[in-house]
Amino acid sequence: MEIRTLTLGELDTNCYIVISAAGNAAVIDPADEAQKILDTLKTENAELKMILLTHGHFDHTGAVAQLKEETGAKVYLHEKDECMTDDTIKNVAYLCPGFEYKPYTADKLLSEGDIIRLDEIEFSVINTPGHTAGSVMFFAENCIFAGDTIFEGSVGRTDFYSGDYTAQKKSLARIAALREDYIIYPGHGISTTLYQEKKFNPYLSVDPISFFG
């Protein structure tokens, strides 16, 4: 499994290209700049097979429509965020008036415990509501593609549509219980490790319930 990282769009969203040994690829959170993603796939001699979305916000999905149209890749999104695919209020694209959002359709609606296979790579789907009701993390080998559930030293906000402060506490408690050798690839900012976040992230380094009060 090889991972390439692109930082895209107005909000500097991390888009991850995961490539199998056979040269097939999954793109996680194609934020914007579809041509840049396509050019990277071409450079890597990789064929896009699937688009995996950690949640439905526009800054993680802005290039989905074009990528799907040009490659035929299948789109995977949690069922509770499907309502965001064509609603610029719910996906908060309205906050960036200059952004031309293109609606798309999801081919596979995800739920907790689903397994997505790309050749030898298995992505396990864990629902981590809080930032949105349909937020998920994708686990593959020792990697967590975390979206906006957790960042280096922080976590995603909960004041947009379907955000839930109480649900976030429960999701973070689940993360805090995981083994520490996972590498976290977040939706924004630099990659980190679960060990580091348990030690230094205030949302994980103390009991989450106590921290939130």
Named regions from a protein language model:
Residues 27-28, 49-56, 75-78, 127-130, ...:
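Active-site neighborhood of phospho(di)ester-bond hydrolases with catalytic His/Asp-centered motifs
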Residues 32-117, 199-207:
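Active-site HxH/HxHxD metal-binding segment of metal-dependent hydrolases
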Residues 90-93, 115, 122-213:
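Metallo-beta-lactamase
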Residues 23, 32, 58, 81, ...:
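Short, glycine/acidic-enriched loop or turn micro-motifs at the edges of active sites
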Residues 2-4, 47, 74, 108, ...:
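Conserved beta-strand segments of alpha/beta enzyme cores
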